[in-house]
Amino acid sequence: MICPIFFLYIINVLFTQYFIKCEGNKVTVISHNNGHNDNLDVNKNGVISQENVFDTSESLNLPSNKKVGSDDLNTTTISFTVPDNLENEVKVVSSSESGKGATVSHTKVTSEGLSDTQPNVTQSVSSSTHTPGSLDSTMSTEQHSSVSQSSLPTESSSETLNKATVPEIPIQINSGLLKNYNGVKVTGSCGSYFRVYLVPHILIYALTKYSVIQLESLFNDNARIDVEHKGELQNKCSEGYHFKLVVYITHNVLNLKWKTYKPNEESKSEDSDVRKYRIPKLERPFTSIQVYTANSKAGVIETKNYNIRTDIPDTCDAIATDCFLNGNVNIEKCFQCTLLVQKKDKSHECFKYVSSEMKKKMNEIKVKAQDDFNPNEYKLIESIDNILSKIYKKANKPFEISKDLINLEDLDYQFKNELLEYCKLLKKVDTSGTLEEYELGNAEDIYNNLTRLLKSHSDENIVTLQGKLRNTAICIKNVDEWILNKRGLTLPSESPSESSSKSDSYLNTFNDKDKNEDKDDMSKNSKEEFKNDDKENSDDQNNNDSNKKDDENNINNGDTNYVYDFDDDDYDNNSYEKDMYESPIKENKNGVIDLEKYGNQIKLKSPYFKNSKYCNYEYCNRWRDKTSCISQIEVEEQGNCGLCWIFASKLHFETIRCMRGYGHFRSSALYVANCSKRKPIDRCEEGSNPLEFLRILDEKKFLPLESNYPYSYTSAGNSCPKLPNSWTNLWGDTKLLFNKKVHRYIGNKGFISHETSYFKNNMDLFIDMVKREVQNKGSVIIYIKTQDVIGYDFNGKGVHSMCGDRTPDHAANIIGYGNYINKKGEKRSYWLIRNSWSYYWGDEGNFRVDMLGPKNCLYNFIHTVVFFKLDLGTIHVPKKKSWKKNVYFLRHNPDFMYSLYYNNYEPETSQDFESENDYDNAFVHGQSNESDETNKEGKNVHNSVEKKIQILHILKHIKDSQIKRGLVKYDNINETKDEHTCSRVNSQDAEKYEECKKFCLTKWNECKDHYSPGYCLTDLYKGEDCNFCYV
């Protein structure tokens, strides 16, 4: 049957963003990213991925005579790729451009095998032709209908989609919903990596290259279990094999069936490996199943959401679905923003599904973010925007395209005055006092400093540059002087006999009483349950030091947990890992493993295996979790004073307090500085180390709040203050625990130091050790070399591969880690380092360095790692409930999409199928081959070695046999790590998208700290063409 021509006309009118052709039983859907006409790229690596969508009947938990995984319906959907160079792109046109000429690939829908009662499958696309906050329209297409092609362009058109034959990339992953079961079947070729998310309680990770399948129970502190812990899998992946994984739930039991086979020989292969896991009774039911896949060669990430149950009203579910299809990673924030933009009353039914905090702050949220700014802030923002618009030669074009800086001789009188006025405003709003100490430069000095910084950040967008122009160093006459007094580290001696300082001798002195006390402490600790939770800041503020010590009689009452430190000697024999898996996981007589009991067993075994979506073995950045205690720790500014050792030590101490449940209270750096026994004149000019930090606090038995004794580097020379009764003591009864000196580290009371030179032939062990410490204590202290390597203009956005030096001169902190792909196509890993040179230095005070650095370095960039060994005492930590009520919209960790792509990425230097033994080595630090970037000395290294990867994210929502699609294009995959990105801006008019995105970028710094940045941007925009809730 042929579709009427007028039917095509109606489609074109209603769906201006999509070009839909039906011919016989063929349906083609092409969607633009968020409604903008941005010349979506389709190159020779285009891939057509195939999906098996099964009937989703209502009899979901009942047994069926039908074979699990049998399919009723096959659909094939088109996928697009993003080439390495967007300049050489092939244009995909929307329906509004169909007259200009385009050809398309087809989507094939077959109806073979459908029962008489099976409803027609509807394919629809997330429409961008709606007003902000409106719901998506859906498009139904008869399976056997077609339209005349008379209105369609021919293949000879000058703007065809495929200008040449497009080779098909082998399909890696297919997935489909099971009929009559709550579950999915996933099939593909061995070597791929995918995830299955049973929303909202269980995540399944499948690294098929190594036949590794892991379960993560989100209801039980993210306890992760490997399916081989029950016993080795009989079905192993190898080159040329395919796999099938069936996941389904029956009667509160999660069933996994795993099978590998040669192509076309599935029926001849061995029996499947079967695993069963008992799921406890949970407040919220499973609502959907999501399958995450990636094709690194095609530059595509795909997310499929199979709806199995809706537990919220249709109106609210439609808003949440709209947020999902536009790529939002924090559905709840997008959901709240939409309600605000739509001006829904608090009595609306959807407000039952937002946080209580949002309800309380309803009126406050509707106030513009910038209303809290002082007049000088307004003027400074305007001045920065003016400078950025004039400093580039092509100021009339969009900012991101113009990177050619004007020459010094091009400075006119007006622009020179603008630069001088900018520095005066910066001096007024700066609280560090830097510009009070240094001489301000003239217009030429400011221009030279500014252009030097901009050249180091040539690839950054306007959001980043607006922040960089708040770095006070730009206004200093002799800018290289800015860093001179910021370095202040001297290495401690290794033993009392070699000690040249009183602090070293003091902390190396101990007696039998010390050892006995430490031994007793450790013995007691081994009998208690470890609980290293990040405690939310709102609860933390109710804690004070009076509740550090509770009645010993309450320890085993079952209602509380007590937090202790643990023995770091475990590293010497790796017992922290051996103890975890020394015996197989026990199952009941029916072969079922209880997930809740397993999670409790893990927590009792070791504190190191406290998993978190913001900090696990592959990725860690707790500052991304804005509800955590650690995220409340601010970036410090040490000023023109060499007290880096104090700031690195106090951050480490504060993260330990957070990890032990004490909450975050900012401690006074000035108190430590002024209670030093050194001469006042030497405190800023001569360096020291964390040993002195511990000595001072152990002697004084006191550490006040920052608000009690505020820091100013100009005051770092006063006498040690007298202690008013009103001051809070953060040190309390803290004890320094002794750790004996062994072959590869220095042990002092409360202090352990590892030098990387001792691990030169075993960096895997060093990396593993540091990761565990960061997981357990929140951070570690590091010694690094900064002279001739790091300056005021250092770009912290990328990853740097740098050598170290024999003698470090600066102390900082490792606060996280992760993986990346370098410009050579190698898989690498990085450390996330926090400095104390202000929020506007680096990347919001941080920077990233490659873990191993270049080849043939004499010294690693991390010279030494230090961590404290303290007994903070016992504290009362209420047990967490297994699930929070009214949490309807979960969010993944920021690294979720990146790690999905990373694990599917095949290094360009090695495409071979790796053996199972290779998995152990790759798992330690994620590196493929050694990098040889930069020079041996690591001098003047500013260029990032990280590869810029463009990504297309395809999102599919399958509900009631209907498929809705959304597309989001990212110019850099690192954008997927950000909670907010302007790439997700939605435009009502395709031609307005660039305008909407530019407005988002320009105004982002004004709205980023608002409770709802999307609502703030909408309020500032005033127009009706843009929807910012998806950012």
Curated annotation (Swiss-Prot):
Keyword Glycoprotein in annotation: yes
Name of the molecule in the record: Serine-repeat antigen protein 6
EC number annotated for this UniProt entry: 3.4.22.-
Similarity comment: family membership: Belongs to the peptidase C1 family.
An example Gene Ontology biological process: proteolysis
Modifications after synthesis and translation: Just prior to merozoite egress from host erythrocytes, proteolytically cleaved by SUB1 to generate the active 75kDa form.
Superkingdom classification of source: Eukaryota
Organism: Plasmodium falciparum (isolate 3D7)
SMART domains: Pept_C1 (SM00645)
Topology versus the membrane: Peripheral membrane protein
Keyword terms, alphabetized: Glycoprotein, Hydrolase, Membrane, Protease, Signal, Thiol protease, Zymogen
Annotated active site: C644, H810, N835
Top EC category: hydrolase
Main localization, broad class: other
Signal peptide start and end residues: 1-24
Glycosylation site residues: N74, N120, N449, N544, N573, N674, N929, N974
Entry GO CC: extracellular space; lysosome; membrane; symbiont-containing vacuole; symbiont-containing vacuole membrane
